[in-house]
C-alpha cells in the first residue's frame, strides 16, 4: 500500500512540473547539411581566392622573366661598350678580373669586368677579349628601364643602353657613328662604324656575325678601331692574312664555331698566306712559278693547304688511325702462324 502511494505521488509530481517544448527540428537538433542553393556562396568565395592566387603567381613569374631579360640585355650591351683599354701597353699574356659596386641614389650598380689577352709567340697573332657584366637595381632589387628592345620604342627611335639604363633615342643621321644597324633607321646601315645610305647587307664594311653573312670575295673579320666584326675584302699580295696552319688561336676562339669571325681574312684566290721574310708576320704571296719574294727567292708553286676546309684536320687524324689499325692487324696475322708452329714443335719434344 505504501509502495502504491509513493508511485502515485511521483506521477503527480511529474505531471505538475512544466516541461519545455520540444525543440524545432531546425533549431537545436543535429545540424542538417545545407542544400545546394546554400553552398554556392561558399564555393564562389573559394574559387575567387584560387583565381586571385593564380593571378599573383603569374604576375610574379612575369616580373622574374622581365628582370631576367633586362639583365641579359644589359650584359650584352655593356659588353659592346668601349673599354678604353690600350692593347699595346698590356703584356703578351694578360688576365684580369674586377668587381665594383657604385651607389647612385637608391640604385646599386654592380659591374664585373674580365680582360684576357693571349698572344701566339710563333705567329704573333693576338686574341683580346673583354667581358663586362652590369647589374642595376634599387633597394628592393627591381630594375626600371624605358625599353628592352628596339621595338619597344616608337618609329625613328631605337633602344640604347647608356649610364646603366635603357632609354629610347632618336635614330642617328647619315655619317654619324654607330655600333649596330638598328641605330641607323630607315634605309641606312652601319658601314665601317658610320650610318650610310644605299648600302646592302653583306657588302664591304657591313656588320656580320659569321662568314655566311658576307658576299663572295669578302670575309667576316674584326678590324682595328671597331668593336664588332665587319665584312672585309680578302687581302691581296703583300697584305696581312690569316694563317690556317696556326691552330692555337683557332682552338681557343673559333674551333667551336668554324664559320665565326676571324682576326684576319684568308688570302684571295691565287695567293697563299706565308711568313713575311724571317718575321712572325704572315702576308699573302703568289703561288705560281717564277714569282720572287723580297729576298729574291723563287716561290715554288704550292697547293692551298687543306686547313681552309672545315673538318680536314679531323679527316687526317682519322686516316692516320685507320692506317695504324691496318698495320697492327697485318702484324698480328703474320705472328699467328709462327706461334702455331712453335706450339707444335713444343708438343713433339714433350
From Swiss-Prot:
Residues that carry a glycan: 26, 28, 96, 106, 121, 204
Stretches assigned to coiled coil: 40-84
Alphabetically ordered keywords of this record: Coiled coil, Developmental protein, Disulfide bond, Glycoprotein, Secreted, Signal, Wnt signaling pathway
Disulfide-bond pairs as recorded: 208-220, 214-231, 219-265, 241-273
Superkingdom: Eukaryota
Tissue expression notes: Highest expression in heart, brain, and spinal cord.
Stretches for region O-glycosylated at one site: 29-46
A single MF term (Gene Ontology): co-receptor binding
Family statement: Belongs to the dickkopf family.
GO (cellular component) term, any one: extracellular space
Keyword Disulfide bond appears in the UniProt entry: yes
Location, primary (coarse class): secreted
The UniProt record lists the keyword Secreted: yes
Extent of the signal sequence: 1-21
Region (DKK-type Cys-2): 208-284
Function: Antagonizes canonical Wnt signaling by inhibiting LRP5/6 interaction with Wnt and by forming a ternary complex with the transmembrane protein KREMEN that promotes internalization of LRP5/6. DKKs play an important role in vertebrate development, where they locally inhibit Wnt regulated processes such as antero-posterior axial patterning, limb development, somitogenesis and eye formation. In the adult, Dkks are implicated in bone formation and bone disease, cancer and Alzheimer disease.
Organism: Homo sapiens (Human)
UniProt free text on domains: The C-terminal cysteine-rich domain mediates interaction with LRP5 and LRP6.
Protein's UniProt name: Dickkopf-related protein 3
One GO term (biological process): negative regulation of cortisol biosynthetic process
Amino acid at each position: 500500500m505504501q509502495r502504491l502511494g509513493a508511485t502515485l505521488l511521483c506521477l503527480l509530481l511529474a505531471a505538475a512540473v512544466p516541461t519545455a517544448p520540444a525543440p524545432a527540428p531546425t533549431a537545436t537538433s543535429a545540424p542538417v547539411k545545407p542544400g545546394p542553393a546554400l553552398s554556392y556562396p561558399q564555393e564562389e568565395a573559394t574559387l575567387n581566392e584560387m583565381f586571385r592566387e593564380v593571378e599573383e603567381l603569374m604576375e610574379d613569374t612575369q616580373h622574374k622573366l622581365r628582370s631576367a631579360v633586362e639583365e641579359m640585355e644589359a650584359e650584352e650591351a655593356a659588353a659592346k661598350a668601349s673599354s678604353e683599354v690600350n692593347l699595346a701597353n698590356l703584356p703578351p699574356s694578360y688576365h684580369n678580373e674586377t668587381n665594383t659596386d657604385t651607389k647612385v641614389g637608391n640604385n646599386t650598380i654592380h659591374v664585373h669586368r674580365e680582360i684576357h689577352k693571349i698572344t701566339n709567340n710563333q705567329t704573333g697573332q693576338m686574341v683580346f677579349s673583354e667581358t663586362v657584366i652590369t647589374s642595376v637595381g634599387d633597394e628592393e632589387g627591381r630594375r626600371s628601364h624605358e625599353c628592352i628592345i628596339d621595338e619597344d620604342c616608337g618609329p625613328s627611335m631605337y633602344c640604347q643602353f647608356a649610364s646603366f639604363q635603357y632609354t629610347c633615342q632618336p635614330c642617328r643621321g647619315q655619317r654619324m657613328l654607330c655600333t649596330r644597324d638598328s641605330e641607323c633607321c630607315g634605309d641606312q646601315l652601319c658601314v665601317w662604324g658610320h650610318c650610310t645610305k644605299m648600302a646592302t647587307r653583306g657588302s664591304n664594311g657591313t656588320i656580320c656575325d659569321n662568314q655566311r653573312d658576307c658576299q663572295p670575295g669578302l670575309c667576316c673579320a674584326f678590324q682595328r678601331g671597331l668593336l664588332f666584326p665587319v665584312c672585309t675584302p680578302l687581302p691581296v699580295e703583300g697584305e696581312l692574312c690569316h694563317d690556317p696552319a696556326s691552330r692555337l688561336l683557332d682552338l681557343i676562339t673559333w674551333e667551336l664555331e668554324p664559320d665565326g669571325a676571324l682576326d684576319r681574312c684568308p688570302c684571295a684566290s691565287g695567293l697563299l698566306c706565308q711568313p713575311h721574310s724571317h718575321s712572325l708576320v704572315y702576308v699573302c704571296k703568289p703561288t705560281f712559278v717564277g714569282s720572287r719574294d723580297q729576298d729574291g727567292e723563287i716561290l715554288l708553286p704550292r697547293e692551298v693547304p687543306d686547313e681552309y676546309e672545315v673538318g680536314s684536320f679531323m679527316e687526317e687524324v682519322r686516316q692516320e688511325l685507320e692506317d695504324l689499325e691496318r698495320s697492327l692487324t697485318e702484324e698480328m696475322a703474320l705472328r699467328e702462324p709462327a706461334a702455331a708452329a712453335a706450339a707444335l714443335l713444343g708438343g713433339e719434344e714433350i
